[in-house]
């Protein structure tokens, strides 16, 4: 995997070992950032189910002001930390918690994000635990990018679908406040 654009363009990034992490492909990542490009420069980014951190790292490379990576897997957390160090990116914080706990902490602290990137496991079908916090951490004019299996059409009450696109076995749905 590599950073596609921005100040760290072409630099490789490390994915955690094992089968528990499914990194977003370069093609999907490039298309996502084409969609959200106007929101990235100077943005506060929240990368949920961060895995390797590829999405948040891409945002930082493209000019995001800050990124918070939420990931529960210890090997993935180490990969994110190594990638941040290797790329020399600043303005990042890694939160080692399950996503619901991490979201609760961010929401409880009153933190708002311009761009929220969520890539839950494709086997996940119940998003109700996320619904409690997602709308609350999204800035008024912010976007939520939600990656799922192509057959899933997520519906997040309190948020409106801006666009939804399929890329092979992946669906990317972009939400905003109505």
Regions found by a protein language model. Name each.
Residues 1-178:
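Class I S-adenosyl-L-methionine-dependent methyltransferase catalytic core
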